Amino acid sequence: MKHLKRNMALLSVAALSFILTACSTAPITSHSTGIWDGVIVYNFSRFIIYLSKLFGGNYGWGIIVFTIIIRIIILPLMIYQTRTTMKTAELQPKLKQLQQKYSSRDAESQQKLREEQQKLYAEAGVNPMAGCLPLIIQLPVMYALYAAVSRTQVLKEGTFLWLQLSDKDPYFILPILAALFTFMSTWLSMKSQPAGSQNGMTSAMTFGMPLVILITALNFPAAITLYWVVTNLFQVGQTLIIQNPFKIQKEREEKIQTEKAKRKAIEKAKRRAMKSKRK
């Protein structure tokens, strides 16, 4: 499932890049038609403008608050994704045992492997596909945000700090921050996983995803990059609260030490019992 989620993340960025290069440039107004332009993008635009007015017409703050609201809305899904990820990480030793048991590449062995994996997931209450939902939801949100900013005149002309929201960040500060917070988010998630569940792909993606975000953000409007900065910063805070890796590692180590102590106590009791029988 971890590989699937990472592939979905890369696919999302690639799909967004493709979509944004081919999207319509017609202005978004109250006369826009269709479900996408007339309903989704238009209402995104209106909501961001409304939020901006609460901050004295500052469209950057409008996008920041909009992003936070989106993250709060999908928070239940993110919590579910986090719990699913943690359960899957705990299953890795058993999944590896199954892979070794059905190491043959013939069709029958691979079918049995899939069946055993599905059985294991079902017993643990894990849905491998559920972890992809937040990624799937956020892609159209980013696309709609891009369309709202680039095709609504007041947002297109909006500024925030040194930024023209419809243009790239001239000083590359936002792309660097977006990549940094992406790295922090993936690194914290990796730290919470059992040591045996990590592999070369995990480490590669910890550094690979921030690089993809950096390269993409360098070529995207500041509004989209600002969204990435805020959403990944939110993710860092969410991880520290819900999936704190330092707390999880401590609890995992305490559990290991407790189990070791129990085994030692059992062995000690057995030795005492053997001595008593000899007497």
UniProtKB/Swiss-Prot annotation:
Organism: Pediococcus pentosaceus (strain ATCC 25745 / CCUG 21536 / LMG 10740 / 183-1w)
Membrane topology: Multi-pass membrane protein
UniProt name for this protein: Membrane protein insertase YidC
Keywords from the named record: Cell membrane, Chaperone, Lipoprotein, Membrane, Palmitate, Protein transport, Signal, Transmembrane, Transmembrane helix, Transport
Record field: compositional bias (Basic residues): 269-279
Molecular functions (GO terms): membrane insertase activity
NCBIfam families on file: yidC_oxa1_cterm
Parts of the chain that traverse the membrane: 35-55, 59-79, 129-149, 170-190, 210-230
Signal peptide: 1-22
Lipid attachment site numbers (N-palmitoyl cysteine): C23
Family assignment from sequence similarity: Belongs to the OXA1/ALB3/YidC family. Type 2 subfamily.
One GO biological process term: protein insertion into membrane
Function according to Swiss-Prot or TrEMBL: Required for the insertion and/or proper folding and/or complex formation of integral membrane proteins into the membrane. Involved in integration of membrane proteins that insert both dependently and independently of the Sec translocase complex, as well as at least some lipoproteins.
Organismal lineage: Bacteria, Bacillati, Bacillota, Bacilli, Lactobacillales
Lipidation feature positions (S-diacylglycerol cysteine): C23
Any one GO CC term of the record: plasma membrane
Regions of compositional bias (Basic and acidic residues) in chain numbering: 253-268
Major subcellular location class: membrane
Region of interest: Disordered: 253-279
Subcellular location: Cell membrane
